[in-house]
């Protein structure tokens, strides 16, 4: 089969290819084809990838998007609209207004989504007309884009992925000396806004043991996370990104007094690409880039879509009854049973009201943002910004929106 990787010049590409090499003994991969608008970066990365792959499968480059996806069974989206300069704006502009600046959350996520939507719309339309491939999406904001594609573009073969769930599973597996597949989580929410209510290892409910372990860890490093009373009260393990919502003042101070993460990543990528020119193994510096277990999440999902083994993956897809007290059409990050090309949601009962309060609020923001893009409406864009829990005051909203639109004028125009 052919796998197309869109955003082939990404610094993550070698790790992704390593994941594909790992599964190539279980499923037949004939060729992996790369497409990126940055041809120079892509050439450096793909030359390195060829040294990694040797002759295990063909490694190709396409100079058009359509050429990459036309015969593909799977298409992986890992492109970054606007590049790291776009991310720098997403992180920097909100800080001027006293708001959290983060690439996927709040105002930064709003800006990133507006840049991504027109490109995603064009790409999905091309895939629909050519290969009808399954699209595995890592492009941020991943859950918001999945909501856009599944519920507005109505392309069903689109699965949003993130590395946060698999890292949760890995940490719990290590805690109990278990395998990844021995761990099951009652896990639900949105991408970067998710909650764990129950933890099972080999069928045993170990939730209380996990909470005790977590509180012991926190008592030794009290400034690094939520206070122990938070877990006693809320009784949920929360996605690390909830810090932006629940520790907003502390996180704003941290972000506003440190170098922007986008600029840090620019420096890391410069080092990485120099290494990639001659490397034959994945450089240790890639660990500084973030995205731990990204390749495992993507490659294992493709492997299990291709086989009949029936494994559980946490992905972004429609609720379809997984959480009883949330609408079926909400795109959520939830555990699913993956087998023979299909993703089936698992019934998890009702969600906790504390978690649901965040999920409903941010889902409505997501939908307002999508509608603002589709209708090219500044009025709806202002409603979206004001509706977000991390959004601006009324006094700042119009100026903030104009600055975001000016920074992204090459990608989107609203009237």
From Swiss-Prot:
The keyword Ribosomal protein does not apply. The active site is at residue 241. Its EC number is 3.2.1.86. Optimum pH is 8.0. Active from pH 6.5 to 10. Mn(2+) binds at residues 162, 192. PROSITE patterns: GLYCOSYL_HYDROL_F4. The record marks 103 as: Increases basicity of active site Tyr. It catalyses: 6-phospho-beta-D-glucosyl-(1->4)-D-glucose + H2O = D-glucose 6-phosphate + D-glucose. Keywords: Carbohydrate metabolism, Glycosidase, Hydrolase, Manganese, Metal-binding, NAD. Pfam families: Glyco_hydro_4 (PF02056), Glyco_hydro_4C (PF11975). GO terms for molecular function: 6-phospho-beta-glucosidase activity; hydrolase activity, hydrolyzing O-glycosyl compounds; metal ion binding; oxidoreductase activity, acting on the CH-OH group of donors, NAD or NADP as acceptor. Belongs to the glycosyl hydrolase 4 family. Is a retaining glucosidase as it hydrolyzes glycosidic bond with retention of anomeric configuration. Reaction mechanism includes redox steps involving NAD and stabilization of intermediates by Mn(2+). This is 6-phospho-beta-glucosidase BglT. The gene is bglT.
């Amino acid at each position: 089969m052919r796998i197309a990787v869109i955003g082939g010049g990404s610094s993550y590409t070698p790790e992704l290819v390593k994941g594909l090499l790992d599964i190539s003994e279980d499923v037949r991969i004939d060729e992996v084809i790369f497409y990126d608008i940055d041809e120079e970066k892509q050439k450096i990365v793909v030359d390195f990838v060829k040294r990694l792959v040797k002759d295990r499968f063909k490694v190709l480059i396409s100079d058009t998007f359509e050429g990459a996806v036309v015969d593909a069974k799977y298409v992986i989206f890992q492109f970054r609209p606007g590049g790291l300069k776009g991310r720098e704006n997403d992180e920097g502009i909100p800080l001027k207004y006293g708001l959290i600046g983060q690439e996927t959350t709040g105002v930064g996520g709003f800006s990133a989504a507006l840049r991504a939507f027109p490109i995603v719309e064009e790409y999905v339309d091309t895939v629909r007309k050519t290969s009808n491939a399954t699209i595995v999406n890592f492009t941020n904001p991943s859950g918001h884009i999945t909501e856009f594609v599944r519920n507005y573009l109505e392309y069903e073969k689109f699965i949003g992925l993130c590395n946060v769930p698999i890292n949760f599973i890995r940490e719990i597996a290590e805690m109990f000396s278990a395998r990844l597949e021995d761990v099951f989580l009652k896990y639900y929410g949105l991408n970067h806004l998710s909650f764990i209510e129950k933890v099972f290892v080999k069928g045993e409910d170990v939730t209380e043991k996990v909470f005790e372990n977590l509180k012991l860890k926190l008592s030794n490093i009290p400034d690094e996370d939520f206070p122990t009373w938070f877990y006693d009260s809320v009784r949920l393990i929360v996605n690390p990104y909830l810090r932006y919502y629940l520790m907003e003042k502390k996180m704003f101070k941290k972000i506003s007094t440190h170098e922007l993460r986008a600029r840090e990543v620019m420096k890391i990528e410069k080092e990485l690409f120099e290494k990639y020119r001659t490397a034959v193994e994945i450089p240790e510096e890639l660990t500084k880039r973030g995205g731990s277990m990204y390749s495992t999440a993507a490659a294992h999902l493709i492997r299990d879509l291709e086989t009949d083994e029936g494994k559980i993956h946490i992905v972004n897809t429609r609720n379809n009854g997984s959480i009883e007290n949330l609408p079926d059409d909400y795109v959520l990050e939830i555990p699913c049973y993956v087998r023979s090309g299909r993703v089936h949601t698992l019934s998890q009962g009702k969600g906790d009201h504390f978690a649901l309060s965040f999920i409903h609020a941010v889902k409505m923001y997501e939908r307002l943002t999508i509608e603002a893009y589709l209708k090219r409406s500044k009025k709806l864009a202002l409603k979206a910004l004001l509706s977000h829990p991390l959004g601006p005051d009324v006094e700042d909203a119009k100026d903030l929106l104009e600055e975001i639109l000016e920074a992204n004028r090459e990608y989107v125009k609203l009237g």
